[in-house]
């Protein structure tokens, strides 16, 4: 069984056509996940305008104990699902490489453009969603010094001189 988590109906239609050999289920919100029915599924997550990280959605996915998770994202988030095997792929992956990845064959899937820790991605998502510093500190339960350290590291990783350049960053749509 394949669970396709996306808000993009064209993406889902494409996945359904590619994965025609199996049972393909479209999931748009966490209430649609049935922990018993979808147990041990193969999960494919599209994060474009659908940032499911750091939400109850990801907790629900972890409870499913999926066989494998493929995440379409320019960000590689270290240990985002604990011990669940996760592969991050860009949306520009070829169909041949994607099918090889689904079948468990070796394929030369390019690495994600940016590699972040869970906490760095969480801080980056909060900044992209225009939360104030105080709200971020309260939500993430971190100190001001830790926040500035994460912010500085993120700016170095993304090659930003000022944090307000983030709104024009090529991957901003994957954070909201």
Curated annotation (Swiss-Prot):
Segments forming domain HTH luxR-type: 109-174
Name of this protein: HTH-type transcriptional regulator DctR
Chain segments annotated as transmembrane: none
Cited Gene3D superfamilies: Winged helix-like DNA-binding domain superfamily/Winged helix DNA-binding domain
SMART domains the UniProt entry points to: HTH_LUXR (SM00421)
Other facts: Overexpression causes filamentous biofilm formation.
PROSITE patterns named in the record: HTH_LUXR_2
DNA-binding region: 133-152
Coiled-coil zones: none
Keyword Transferase recorded: no
UniProt KW keywords: DNA-binding, Transcription, Transcription regulation
Lineage of source species: Bacteria, Pseudomonadati, Pseudomonadota, Gammaproteobacteria, Enterobacterales
